[in-house]
Every structure is written in structure tokens, then in C-alpha cells.
């Protein structure tokens, strides 16, 4: 018997279409303390970021593993850790590579602007590298919505405070898993690790904008390939390659029956797919993410998202589904099937729309953090 309810996140076109685009030449200054200041002007705004190191999002023993639980040595974790920066006040999560000159910057700012190195690497201005800034937007023709399945409660709930790591905030420990198609999409292990790390950093930045007190800690990454991917992945697909929603049930059972140290320690196990999910192959809509509700209280840890090619866009899906796993509903919604103490511990203000729902008071406000 599965816990209480499952959230189905579906989209008609794309979760986060791209708005305005502009080429910028950001400056990067580093202080003796390790803080960085990044400045640029984009879309009519002067941007100044005061960035602090954010390598703590990676666990101390963070590593990349293959599907056989073998640690991969091809990734320089400490170098990656040093490149991670955040400015919580401005909703910024960035990967800054100082080894390249001029420095390259990739990530999100104000929770609504994506910045990345321009493909014309040789284009510079006064020693500054060209970058592209894209506005992430939502519109009425491209939105996310949910459906809910509510079976009976059969599992005893445990205290939400079990994930309190005695830190100043609540630390959510996460294991992210890639299907074989996602693994193949990344040219190298390093590229895959950078994508997943940036995905996690942007997801945390979105949570910080909600004043949630949540901090993510990425325990590790598990990558499946043709040789190691469990049969349940193919068994859960339609002929056109889209996953069936039952996939989340099956992958949840898989980690229950085949636990590893990472999966046992994780509060949430996120599965990164390269396809959406559909009830029927010819459905007009597709699920872009699925999650068990209140998984931190039940042991049903799995959630899955369609991980778009841009990590900054996929982060909206991951943040939405992880929030459901932690007991958050859509803005303005409440389900009586959820224990009262959970709903009181975690609440989502109506002014934040990462948990928006395309109906009622929140019509047209889907995934707007600004």
C-alpha cells in the first residue's frame, strides 16, 4: 500500500519557456575571503551579486557511482566544490570557472534569469567573456498542473524532524539517479556531474526564495547505463518511449528491495529522465514530474522528473516535486488526508508560485517566483 497520495505534474508544452535574451559581459572580482562579486547589466537591470562559496551542497563524501555502486574516479569533486557560489538574497546559484580566463559563469539569478557562457567563446569586451542571459517565464499556454491519487492511510507517520541535522536549517539529503538515456546525453562523467550539481544548486536557490529554511545536501549521483539499468525502466515505457506513471511505484520498490548506503541515508531519491510520463501513449498531456506526498514521513522516497537539457529549467520540476515529497501542496490548497502536524510544520505562502496551480486564484501564476 502506498502512502496517502501521489502528485502528478503535467505540462502541455514546456515547463519554463524562454523569454527575453541578451548578451552581457559580466565582471568577476574575488576578495581575499573567497567571496566573489559579479556585475553586469541585463534586460534593463543593473545586477550586482555578492556571492559566497556554496560547496557545502555536496556531501563530504560525495561521489559519482555507476549502476553497480562502483565509485567513478574521473570527476574532480574538490574542484567542482570550489566553483559553486550562491547569493541567497538575490536568488542566485552559480557555477563559476576561474580556471578559464576570462571566467565562465553558469546558473540562475533572481530565480528568473539564466546566465551561461555564449557559444562564441572568443568574443570578449575589455577582458570580459560574452555570456547569454535568458529570462525564464511562464504563460497561459504552457503550464504545469497536478492530479492526485488518494488511497487509504496504512503507514504509521514519523516525525518530520527526523531530517533535522542539528544545523541552523533543515538539511534534506538527496540521492539523484539518471536513467541510461540521460547518462548517454552527457558526453563525459564530468559534464554529467556538473549538470546534476547545478540542478541541485538552483533547486536549493528556489527553496531559499521561499524562506523555507531548507538546505539541500547532495549525497551522490548514481548513473544507469545499458549494462546496469534495471529492467523496470523498459518495462515501464510505452512503445513511443514515454514512461508510464507506474514507473515511480516500481523504482520506489526497487530501492526498498535493493537498498544501498546512499539510498538508505537519503531523504529523497530523485530520478532524472529524458522523457515525460503519460497515462496513455496518445494522451494530449504529459507528466513532467511525479512524487509521493510526505515521503520523508513514510519511506516512499522516490520522485521522478523530466530533466530538460538545461539544468536551470529542470530545477523548477525538481523543486516542485521535492516540495510535494516534503508535504507541500499547491498554493491555496489543503488536503484533509494529510496529518495536521505536517501541514502546520510546512506551509507555502500564497505569494510564491513555485507551487502554483493553474486554477482559481492562482490561474496564470504557475511557477512564478517574481
From Swiss-Prot:
Positions of Zn(2+) binding: 320, 324, 330
Glycosylated residues, chain numbering: 226
GO cellular component: extracellular region
Tissue expression profile of the protein: Expressed by the venom gland.
Location(s), subcellular: Secreted
Superkingdom assignment: Eukaryota
N-terminal signal peptide: 1-15
Domain Peptidase M12B per the UniProt entry, residue ranges: 170-370
Alphabetical keyword list: Glycoprotein, Hydrolase, Metal-binding, Metalloprotease, Protease, Secreted, Signal, Toxin, Zinc
MF terms (GO), sorted A to Z: metal ion binding; metalloendopeptidase activity; toxin activity
One Pfam family recorded for the sequence: Reprolysin_5
E.C. numbers: 3.4.24.-
Active site as annotated: 321
Any GO BP: membrane protein ectodomain proteolysis
Family statement drawn from the similarity comment of this UniProt entry: Belongs to the venom metalloproteinase (M12B) family.
The protein's role, per its UniProt record: Metalloprotease that may disrupt the cell matrix and the process of clotting blood or hemolymph.
The name this protein goes by in its record: Metalloproteinase
Biological source species: Tityus obscurus
Organism lineage: Eukaryota, Metazoa, Ecdysozoa, Arthropoda, Chelicerata
